[in-house]
């Protein structure tokens, strides 16, 4: 899949080129890129309607029936949604967008970044799209920041409070007043790694879906995208480079924080030590990276949770009750496994995802506005949704899990 980039950006023109063959329309893996001239008259007319107090859904309806190019209309609509949602800190999954915006608006707005993260736009439905489905939120934000005039005016000149307080974005869906949106008083950061393509081990097809769903679940649980570091198909060197970048992020916080580290991929148990296998076959010992994390945290009351969706099988398989000393003697740190010692973590061929991660994500997404008594209970609920009376997960650690409010 070829990558696109902004070739030049000015006040009057936006040009996006394809790195491989410079075609406007490549293949079904790419979206249509319209390199038409940006029409300032269109933007200024829309801006005037907003500043005159017109409801945003009427303005969007105006743009949809205008004679301006499809790309410009969708870009502006996407920017509206992006700026408004960012102003009230609503980051979440596809279902969160349905709740606040409505599916009809989402489907019609190709430039809406979070929608594009999770849902692929196919060849027949891609006319006018400006960002490929594979771009993550940070890449989308970088692109939007290049639209200097549009972005600056929307963020500085429009009254976002009046837009957010009950003004409809579509005929039947309304944004909640910003005062009713619960914002977390706790800083939450996360490190996500998913290894799928191995040089010496079986490929894990469901890992990418696991990572994407877990990432979106965190966004819906008051994790800001700027505080999430994620890594796909990493060798040993790349992992440590990213890990120490993450530790620098952790060290930048003086106050209480909650840290979630998620891993999906191959793993093995060696003399009681769980090792995460990188794509080049080299292992990373979980207890070692846990120690580096706890040493980097400056507030002793902070919580650390490792969620590991991998096999714990190996030549030296230990019974389930065997403690992991490096975790057991640490305050406020725990590790949640998808399976017990000597067991395998399974993928669903039908769902193309890990069974544990899918169930876990579904459960915390549904319960994100409620207090969770214990991670163990939560995981039991998740697993039993698929396998009756199955309780293969395990939690090792000694902190009060009720402190974690997803």
UniProtKB/Swiss-Prot annotation:
What are the alphabetically sorted keywords of the record?
Hydrolase, Protease
Q: Which domain of life is it from?
A: Eukaryota
Active site feature: 266, 311
Show which residues constitute the signal peptide: none
Pfam families in UniProt? Peptidase_C14 (PF00656)
Q: Which GO terms fall under molecular function for this chain's record?
A: cysteine-type endopeptidase activity
Q: Which family does it belong to?
A: Belongs to the peptidase C14B family.
What is this protein identified as?
A: Paracaspase
Q: Which gene holds the coding sequence for this protein?
A: pcp
């Amino acid at each position: 899949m070829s990558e696109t980039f902004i070739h030049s950006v000015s006040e009057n023109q936006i040009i996006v080129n394809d790195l491989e063959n410079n075609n406007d329309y490549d293949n079904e893996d790419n979206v249509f890129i319209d390199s038409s001239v940006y029409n300032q008259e269109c933007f200024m007319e829309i801006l005037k309607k907003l500043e005159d107090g017109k409801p945003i859904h009427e303005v969007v309806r105006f743009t949809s029936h205008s004679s301006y190019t499809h790309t410009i209309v969708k870009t502006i609509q996407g920017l509206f949604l992006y700026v408004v949602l960012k102003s009230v800190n609503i980051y979440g999954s596809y279902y969160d967008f349905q709740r606040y915006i409505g599916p009809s608006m989402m489907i019609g707005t190709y430039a809406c970044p979070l929608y594009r993260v999770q849902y692929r736009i196919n060849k027949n439905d891609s006319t006018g799209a400006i960002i490929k489905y594979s771009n993550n939120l940070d890449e989308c934000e970088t692109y939007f920041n290049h639209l200097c005039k549009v972005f600056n005016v929307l963020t500085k000149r429009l009254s976002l409070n009046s837009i957010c307080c009950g003004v409809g974005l579509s005929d039947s869906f309304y944004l909640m007043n910003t005062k009713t949106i619960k914002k977390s008083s706790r800083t939450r950061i996360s490190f996500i790694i998913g290894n799928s393509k191995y040089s010496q081990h079986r490929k894990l097809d469901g890992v990418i879906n696991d990572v994407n769903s877990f990432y979106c679940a965190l966004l819906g649980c008051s994790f800001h995208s700027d505080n999430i570091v994620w890594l796909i198909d990493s060798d040993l060197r790349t992992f440590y480079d990213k890990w120490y970048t993450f530790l620098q992020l952790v060290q930048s916080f003086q106050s209480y924080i909650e840290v979630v580290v998620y891993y999906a991929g191959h793993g093995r148990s060696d003399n009681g030590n769980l090792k995460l296998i990188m794509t080049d076959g080299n292992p990373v010992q979980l207890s070692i990276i846990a120690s580096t994390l706890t040493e980097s945290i400056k507030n002793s009351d902070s919580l650390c949770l490792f969620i590991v969706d991998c096999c714990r099988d190996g030549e030296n398989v230990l019974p389930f009750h065997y403690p992991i000393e490096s975790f057991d003697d640490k305050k406020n740190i725990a590790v949640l496994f998808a399976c017990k010692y000597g067991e395998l973590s399974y993928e669903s061929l039908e769902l193309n995802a890990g069974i544990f991660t899918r169930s876990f994500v579904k459960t915390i997404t549904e319960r994100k506005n409620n207090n969770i008594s214990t991670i163990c209970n939560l995981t039991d609920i998740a697993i039993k949704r698929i396998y009756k009376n199955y309780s293969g997960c395990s939690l090792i650690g000694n902190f009060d899990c009720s402190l974690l409010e997803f």
